[in-house]
Amino acid sequence: MRNSDTLVIDLEKEYKVLSTAGCPKIYKDVRYIVFRRVPKDFEYVDLDGYCKDTAKSVGIDYEKSTIFLTAVDVREYGHATHIFRDVIAEVYVTFGVDKPSCIDANIPSNAMAVGTINVAVIVNKPLDEVGLLDLYRLVSEVKGLAMGLAGPMCLTAPSIGTASDATMVAAPQGGERFGGIATDVGFTAAVATLKALSKFVVGTNCIEYFVNSVGLRSIDDILKIAVKAYNKAPIPMLSSGEVEKILRREFEDVFKDPNICIVVRGARLAEMLMALNLFPGISEEEYRVDTPKIIADELIGKAIAEYVNGFKGLLAYYWIERLKEEGVFEELENLPPMTDDIVAAVVGSVLSRVYDKYLNSH
């Protein structure tokens, strides 16, 4: 059964399950997996009662079901299968991330950001309870890895998921007590999980990917900075409203090039390592105060600006940097040390393209 609100998966036989879904099942025998769509502001005190009603509404046994809750259209789920030797792993994912939760003691409010990533993994390899727990650990690690490397980022810290993520692993009851990455079942489940999660990354357009990578809410955040800079050197007869539309088109054109997103993502991953004190030779404190010993941010900004519009792009990047030092952009002042150079370079180089096109045509 599948519609926009409910996806029911019949495993056709019972599996031993370890699940932290909305209505969890801990080492229970389960035949049905349900993904149920709920409102984003969903607050239900009696979750067991809600799940029992859900199971009844779709004609399945609640005691033999594990029920995930999500705010996304469940028809947009991810699915993948991987086979290695004699092991088959099948994975179902729903992905709803308005904003990720982050590892940063300085921004505890982000820990309660809205979003849910549900991951259900089914393997044909019989496992005992310890093996199932080991497999659960591995799947959680893989999901965190995928989010940290490719998912949305917070402004000053990486993410490993959201505040309400849920995971389920299912296997026939057996005697195998190992399910880690060095086992056939663990390796197979890990690959299948990455395949299922990848749908939600590769399906992202480059603008959205850029915004997610630098921890902003939307392209409008960058447009606001660009328009503010334009107002410092306006073109006669071209209003702020008109230039905003032109800039939006230019940003869309620039972000069609995946090379920009490759450079930006790489820089942000390095920045996250420094923010977590995981980068050799650079302490967290040095990173936080933007120590002069780190010049990678300027090198990256220079590379982006020149790539987008050559020497004119570079000059415009330096112009944005000077305006930033004068206190024109409070938005840039709140960005991390490397991210502010990334945004300044993108804004400056795109603005320089607008000046080029408009002034050369008039």
Regions found by a protein language model. Name each.
Residues 207-267:
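N-terminal interaction modules that seed assembly of large macromolecular complexes
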Residues 315-362:
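Glycine-rich, aromatic-bearing surface loops/beta-hairpins
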Residues 147-154, 201-204, 230, 234, ...:
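Long, hydrophobic, amphipathic alpha-helical segments used as structural scaffolds
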Residues 228-229, 271-275, 283, 325, ...:
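Aliphatic-rich, non-membrane protein domains
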Residues 2, 6-13, 17-20, 291-330:
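Mature-region segments of soluble proteins
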Residues 1-206:
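Alpha/propeptide regions of enzymes that mature by internal proteolysis
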Residues 244-318:
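Long, charge-patterned amphipathic interaction tracts in eukaryotic proteins
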Residues 220, 224, 228-232, 249-256, ...:
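Extended, non-membrane alpha-helical segments enriched in charged/polar residues
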